[in-house]
From Swiss-Prot:
It comes from Ruegeria pomeroyi (strain ATCC 700808 / DSM 15171 / DSS-3) (Silicibacter pomeroyi). Binds the 23S rRNA. One of its GO terms (molecular function) is rRNA binding. Pfam families: Ribosomal_L31 (PF01197). This is Large ribosomal subunit protein bL31. GO terms for biological process: translation. The lineage of its organism: Bacteria, Pseudomonadati, Pseudomonadota, Alphaproteobacteria, Rhodobacterales. Belongs to the bacterial ribosomal protein bL31 family. Type A subfamily. Keywords: Ribonucleoprotein, Ribosomal protein, RNA-binding, rRNA-binding. The gene is rpmE. One of its GO terms (cellular component) is ribonucleoprotein complex. Part of the 50S ribosomal subunit.
Amino acid sequence: MKKDIHPDYHMIDVKLTDGTVIQMKSTWGKEGDTLSLEIDPSSHPAWTGGSSRLMDTGGRVSKFKKKYEGLGF
Protein backbone atom coordinates (compact mmCIF):
# COMPACT_ATOMS: atom_id res chain seq x y z
CA MET A 1 0.00 0.00 0.00
CA LYS A 2 1.23 3.50 -0.77
CA LYS A 3 1.97 5.74 2.18
CA ASP A 4 0.39 9.16 2.80
CA ILE A 5 -2.48 8.76 0.30
CA HIS A 6 -5.21 7.69 2.73
CA PRO A 7 -7.32 10.12 4.79
CA ASP A 8 -6.77 10.45 8.54
CA TYR A 9 -8.80 7.89 10.53
CA HIS A 10 -9.77 9.32 13.94
CA MET A 11 -12.43 9.29 16.70
CA ILE A 12 -15.55 11.47 16.32
CA ASP A 13 -18.79 11.81 18.30
CA VAL A 14 -22.01 10.85 16.50
CA LYS A 15 -25.22 12.35 17.94
CA LEU A 16 -28.31 10.26 17.18
CA THR A 17 -31.82 11.70 16.81
CA ASP A 18 -32.74 10.67 20.37
CA GLY A 19 -29.80 12.64 21.79
CA THR A 20 -27.54 9.65 22.42
CA VAL A 21 -23.89 10.33 21.62
CA ILE A 22 -21.64 7.50 20.52
CA GLN A 23 -17.97 7.53 19.58
CA MET A 24 -16.70 5.88 16.44
CA LYS A 25 -13.77 6.01 14.09
CA SER A 26 -14.24 7.94 10.86
CA THR A 27 -12.48 9.92 8.16
CA TRP A 28 -15.18 12.65 8.47
CA GLY A 29 -14.18 15.96 10.07
CA LYS A 30 -11.43 16.27 12.63
CA GLU A 31 -10.62 14.46 15.87
CA GLY A 32 -13.39 15.19 18.41
CA ASP A 33 -15.89 16.74 15.94
CA THR A 34 -19.60 15.95 16.40
CA LEU A 35 -21.72 14.59 13.55
CA SER A 36 -25.46 15.12 14.17
CA LEU A 37 -27.70 12.68 12.33
CA GLU A 38 -31.11 13.69 10.97
CA ILE A 39 -32.22 10.09 10.58
CA ASP A 40 -30.83 6.91 12.13
CA PRO A 41 -31.92 3.30 12.84
CA SER A 42 -34.20 4.45 15.68
CA SER A 43 -36.15 6.85 13.44
CA HIS A 44 -35.89 5.40 9.91
CA PRO A 45 -39.07 3.70 8.64
CA ALA A 46 -37.06 0.79 7.19
CA TRP A 47 -35.92 -0.20 10.70
CA THR A 48 -39.03 0.84 12.63
CA GLY A 49 -41.50 -0.99 10.41
CA GLY A 50 -42.87 2.26 9.02
CA SER A 51 -44.21 3.36 12.40
CA SER A 52 -41.99 6.44 12.55
CA ARG A 53 -43.12 9.58 10.75
CA LEU A 54 -40.81 10.56 7.90
CA MET A 55 -39.03 13.86 8.57
CA ASP A 56 -39.78 16.51 5.93
CA THR A 57 -36.36 18.06 5.34
CA GLY A 58 -36.67 21.16 3.20
CA GLY A 59 -40.28 20.40 2.25
CA ARG A 60 -39.28 17.60 -0.12
CA VAL A 61 -41.85 15.12 1.18
CA SER A 62 -44.62 17.74 0.95
CA LYS A 63 -43.55 18.66 -2.58
CA PHE A 64 -43.59 14.97 -3.62
CA LYS A 65 -47.03 14.38 -2.08
CA LYS A 66 -48.45 17.49 -3.78
CA LYS A 67 -47.00 16.50 -7.16
CA TYR A 68 -48.41 12.96 -7.00
CA GLU A 69 -51.54 13.50 -4.88
CA GLY A 70 -53.83 12.03 -7.55
CA LEU A 71 -52.05 8.67 -7.39
CA GLY A 72 -52.97 8.02 -3.76
CA PHE A 73 -49.56 8.29 -2.10
